[in-house]
């Protein structure tokens, strides 16, 4: 079974959970696993250390994202593809897992389209258009490269940096990048591991949703979970059998999610 796993930035901030590494080690012998990691809070931390104040913008839909100018794009790559990816690979290596880290720019793994403009809400609540910076959306995935690594027993670790048509690095959303990888490689499942059990509505964990039900819930949830739900819907609509939103801090987090234990499942049925 081919599974794409997105390890959320909230988990990377505290260091890679040992329970997650142990679970990947156990599952890697019987499943083909592809990891995509986040790490936005760590990017902000290192940008501040370097004296580069970070700017965040909010879309008319209420989704908050980092504004990525040229200097921020360099810091983003350094932290994501350098520090965090290697930290994850070293943890996997220590557990006996063959892994290899790739930025989405390596081998044109993630091909993206640079956004020329961003429509954001200013401090007065007005919609304004600003330069898109080095932000984009994944348009294509080099699935043959990933299939080659999987055939040799590797667990690919992907940093969410895409390559534009002009060979520029692009900051792309990690959740939606994981969705694109799952769709592009024909994965059976994509799991979004975060620091909560799944989607909560009215104080209760949502166990299952169809893509249409999940889309309808978007106005009711916070921006962090919004991105995961949007990515989950995109994956299922793209042919992935199921998308799972689950906690990465519990024992055997991926195994539990695949068993639909205390998580949110988004699927057609």
Predicted segments, located by residue:
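C-terminal catalytic "cap/lid" subdomain
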Residues: 1-64, 68-269
């Amino acid at each position: 079974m081919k599974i794409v796993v997105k390890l959320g930035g909230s988990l990377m901030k505290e260091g890679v959970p040992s329970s997650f590494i142990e679970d990947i080690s156990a599952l890697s012998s019987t499943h083909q696993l592809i990891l995509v990691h986040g790490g936005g809070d760590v990017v902000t931390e290192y940008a501040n250390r370097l004296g580069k104040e970070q700017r965040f913008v909010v879309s008319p839909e209420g989704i908050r994202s980092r504004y990525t100018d040229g200097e921020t794009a360099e810091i983003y790559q350094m932290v994501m593809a350098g520090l965090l990816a290697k930290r994850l690979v070293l943890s996997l290596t220590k557990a006996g897992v063959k892994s290899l880290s790739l930025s989405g720019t390596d081998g044109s793994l993630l091909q993206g389209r640079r956004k020329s403009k961003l429509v954001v809400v200013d401090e007065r609540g007005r919609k304004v258009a600003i330069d898109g910076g080095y932000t984009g959306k994944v348009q294509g995935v080099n699935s043959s490269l990933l299939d080659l690594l999987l055939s040799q027993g590797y667990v690919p670790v992907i940093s969410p940096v895409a390559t534009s048509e002009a060979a520029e690095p692009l900051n792309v959303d990690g959740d939606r990048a994981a969705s694109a990888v799952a769709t592009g490689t024909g994965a059976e499942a994509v799991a979004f591991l975060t620091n909560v059990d799944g989607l909560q509505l009215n104080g209760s964990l949502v166990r299952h949703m169809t893509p249409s039900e999940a889309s309808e819930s978007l106005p009711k949830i916070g921006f962090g979970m919004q991105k995961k739900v949007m990515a989950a819907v995109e994956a299922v609509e793209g042919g992935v059998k199921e998308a799972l939103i689950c906690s990465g801090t519990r024992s055997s987090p991926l195994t539990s999610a695949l068993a639909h234990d205390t998580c949110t499942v988004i699927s057609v049925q």
